[in-house]
UniProtKB/Swiss-Prot annotation:
Domain of life assignment: Bacteria
Family designation: Belongs to the universal ribosomal protein uS17 family.
Classification lineage: Bacteria, Pseudomonadati, Pseudomonadota, Betaproteobacteria, Nitrosomonadales
Name listed for the protein in its UniProt record: Small ribosomal subunit protein uS17
Species of the source: Nitrosomonas eutropha (strain DSM 101675 / C91 / Nm57)
Span of the signal peptide: none
Keyword field: Ribonucleoprotein, Ribosomal protein, RNA-binding, rRNA-binding
InterPro entries linked to this entry: NA-bd_OB-fold, Ribosomal_uS17, Ribosomal_uS17_bact/chlr, Ribosomal_uS17_CS
């Protein structure tokens, strides 16, 4: 898939693939501390839909917004960026 056509996508690393058709993706971002100015890494975890259970822990993937698939899952994996 072409990432240019996606409305919103994020790139992150898969940290869990234990559930059926679901992966947990950690998205890291860099922020500057408001007082001290140090660059800090903040992260957030998203559950994403993996239809064919083809992605493994350590893979870097792009995820895109989708309709709600379950209570906590409203993202889907659109392509692998780097295979571990």
């Amino acid at each position: 898939m072409n990432l240019d056509n996606q409305s919103k996508y994020l790139i992150g690393q898969i940290i869990s693939d234990k559930r059926d058709k679901t992966v947990t993706v950690r998205i890291d971002r860099k922020v500057k501390h408001p007082l001290y100015g140090k660059i800090i890494t903040r992260s957030k975890k998203y559950h994403a839909h993996d239809e064919h259970n083809q992605y493994k822990v350590g893979d870097v993937v792009a995820i895109s917004e989708a309709r709600p698939i379950s209570k906590t899952k409203s993202w889907r994996v659109i392509k692998v960026v780097k295979i571990n």
